[in-house]
UniProtKB/Swiss-Prot annotation:
The keyword Thylakoid applies. It is a peripheral membrane protein. Residues 184-193 have a biased composition (Basic and acidic residues). This is NAD(P)H-quinone oxidoreductase subunit I. Binds 2 [4Fe-4S] clusters per subunit. PANTHER family: NAD(P)H-QUINONE OXIDOREDUCTASE SUBUNIT I, CHLOROPLASTIC. It catalyses: a plastoquinone + NADH + (n+1) H(+)(in) = a plastoquinol + NAD(+) + n H(+)(out); a plastoquinone + NADPH + (n+1) H(+)(in) = a plastoquinol + NADP(+) + n H(+)(out).
Amino acid sequence: MFNNILKQVGDYAKESLQAAKYIGQGLAVTFDHMSRRPITVQYPYEKLIPSERFRGRIHFEFDKCIACEVCVRVCPINLPVVDWEFNKAVKKKELKHYSIDFGVCIFCGNCVEYCPTNCLSMTEEYELAAYDRHDLNYDNVALGRLPYKVTEDPMVTPLRELGYLPKGVIEPHNLPKGSQRAGQHPEDLVKAE
């Protein structure tokens, strides 16, 4: 009987040490994760900067499109809608309308990759939420708008903004007043016509 009690005490001690070991391993993992940087952000107020190859909303350039419909053929769900007419005078297709429904799009990037004229490109824009699903059907006008930038942080300047500065100027804040930037804004194009 005395041996039975000693055996039970010994087993209890072994199980206690084993439980302490497992608790120690769990705490080690917890402390390891506590020393890492946080992964989550407070989304509406903080936004992550997308990676260089991020596949966001598709940007479409109407003037470059030759209405070849390669984007429709490579799309796994035949999503882009391309309306064109054949111009007999110049013997070419003329694009009339182009649209993509982002409520259905899976953002695979095949249309961008296989486009022969590079009229399609992926942007960093990922905020496409809408109250009505029909608002997600972007036509050629909505697809042609480039988003300004994802973050409002002035320290983060996308390279595409540097492309609109005059030659030799890297910092947009050093521009003299009234200096003309390279490229035209949409409102300048409307005034010119």
